[in-house]
Structures are given as C-alpha cells and as structure tokens.
C-alpha cells in the first residue's frame, strides 16, 4: 500500500542530494519472519549527505495483515531544522493510520515561527488528515508540531489525499533545507547534537512499534533494531539504569 510513498521519497532523495550509503548494523537491514498468518519481511535503507546526516526508512510487508512505512530524516548538526517524521501503518486493510510531521527540536517561539508556522498552510489544506487524535504513547507537545497530519483513514484516501499531502510536506521540507543557514558556532552545534540525541532517547523509550517488531521478529532482534538502527543515539533503559 505504501510502496509508492517509498519510491517517491527515494526518487526525491537521489535527485536532490549527493547521497552516500550509511552502514546498517549486520542482521538489521533485512529479515523475514515466519510468525503469524502471513510471513513478514522488513527491509531498511539508510543514507547521508552533506545536508542530512541520517536518512532512514523502513518497510514492513506482511501481506494483507500489515503494511508499514516509517522514515525519519535528521538534518546535519549544523542545521537546526526539525526532523522530518513519516509513519504510515495499515493493518488488515481496514485500519490505516498516518502520521506526517516536521518534528521540532525546540519549543521556543522564535523556533516555532521559523520552522513550524510555515506548515499551517498545508495543515489547513488537508483538514481531513488532521483529526486531532489522542496520542497514547507520546506527549503531543514534545517533538510534534501543532500542524502534524495524524489521521485514521481508508485505503482510497491513502492513495489520493495522503499521497498528495506527502508530496507537499516533502517539498516544503526540501525548500526549508535549501533556505537554511548553516550554523558555525560550536555551542549552537552542540545544542543541536544534544537535541537530536534527546529525540532518539525519548522515541526509543516510548516507541510502540517495538512490540510489533518483537511479535514478528523476536524480542532480541527488536531491541537491536530499536537501539542500533532506528534510534542509535539512545541508551537502552537497562544500561542507563545501571550507570546510576
């Protein structure tokens, strides 16, 4: 269901940026599960460029049982742009959940006006995809913008409205990146480093997908995937607790 989204993202990335492959830890790039009614495959890709230090995207194909496309784009540490977050999930062809956002690193007014306010036009363009659903695992005020698209919808809407919104959000993000001024002050850069690490930690501690990964691919593999690839700057809770 979400293969056209993956293909569009990939085409955009290769056309716009001088990409280099980024190493995915052994055993995490691809895996097949024989659990459940439909075998599931998970495949991930990871790249970097001068402007973007980590571009990761993952596709889970479990046939009619599940189709999942997830991606996060991390700007280089000398840019204070939000992260681009994409999470599209379908279960049994009837439950379709889409999340698309510029995920802010900071909440101060200047930052919000600079990077989040420009999203308002697109948010208003897709009111049917901005459903103000409850976030069960996250604080909506942390690492999410007030103009995120967050909706439960049907397969036809995914292929039309959601795909159109996806293209619009990507185009605005690329434009913001092109217009961004690189930071050179070491203190500014360290602030970005910390903010992106904090994002990884926050996300790894709360990501509800870890249970899904475990159900398909086993707990040990899921933990590695979460902490060595998806959110590699996060410290596993057991490790952080032992250091106290």
From Swiss-Prot:
This enzyme's EC code(s): 1.3.7.2
Question: Which InterPro entries would you find in this protein's record?
Answer: DiHydbiliverdin_OxRdtase (IPR023658), Ferredoxin-dep_bilin_Rdtase (IPR009249)
Q: Does the keyword Oxidoreductase apply?
A: yes
Q: Per UniProt, which keywords does this protein have?
A: Oxidoreductase
Task: From the UniProt record, list the reaction(s) this protein catalyses.
Answer: 15,16-dihydrobiliverdin + oxidized 2[4Fe-4S]-[ferredoxin] = biliverdin IXalpha + reduced 2[4Fe-4S]-[ferredoxin] + 2 H(+)
Q: Name one GO biological process term.
A: phytochromobilin biosynthetic process
Q: Which domain of life is it from?
A: Bacteria
GO function term, MF aspect, one: 15,16-dihydrobiliverdin:ferredoxin oxidoreductase activity
Its function, per the record, reads: Catalyzes the two-electron reduction of biliverdin IX-alpha at the C15 methine bridge.
In terms of NCBIfam families, this protein maps to: PRK13247.1
Q: Which family does it belong to?
A: Belongs to the HY2 family.
- Protein name as annotated: 15,16-dihydrobiliverdin:ferredoxin oxidoreductase
What is the scientific name of the source organism? Nostoc punctiforme (strain ATCC 29133 / PCC 73102)
